[in-house]
């Protein structure tokens, strides 16, 4: 669809519920994700205690030229329902909207 301001290029299948997207210093996309949307919905409605968290990195080089990599995946016991992943130096800061803290993860 074209509205004069934006042209559609492509969809990128990620196999997870992508939430907020951030960029690193070289242009990779980072996102906090919900790998199980049914568990996330139940968690958001207060029907489950935890929901899994996932962080993905997308190296986008152009149309049909990208890689999607899971860099963090856990069952929600460390942090439920990650909604953002912000790279900073060799760290990733991850947060969600339900907790009053965020994670600091170190990349190796």
Name each model feature, range by range:
Residues 14-73:
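Loop/turn-rich, solvent-exposed surfaces of beta-rich toroidal or solenoidal domains
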Residues 76-108:
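Blade-level signature of beta-propeller repeat domains, shared across WD40, Kelch, NHL, RCC1
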Residues 1-4, 57-64, 106-108:
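Short loop/turn segments immediately following beta-strands, especially the blade-tip
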Residues 1-7, 30-34:
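Short N-terminal helix-initiation segments at or just after the protein's N-terminus
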Residues 10, 19, 80-83:
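Structural signature of WD-repeat beta-propeller blades
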Residues 7-9, 69:
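A structural motif specific to WD40 beta-propellers
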């Amino acid at each position: 669809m074209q509205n004069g301001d934006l042209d559609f290029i492509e969809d990128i299948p990620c196999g997870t519920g992508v939430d907020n997207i951030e960029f690193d210093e070289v242009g990779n996309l980072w996102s906090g994700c919900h790998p199980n949307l049914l568990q996330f919905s139940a968690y958001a409605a207060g029907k489950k205690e935890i929901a899994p968290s996932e962080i993905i990195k997308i190296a986008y080089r152009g149309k049909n030229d990208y890689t999607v990599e899971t860099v963090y995946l856990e069952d929600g016991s460390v942090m439920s329902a990650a909604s953002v992943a912000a790279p900073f130096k060799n760290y990733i800061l991850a947060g969600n909207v339900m907790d009053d803290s965020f994670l600091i993860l170190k990349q190796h």
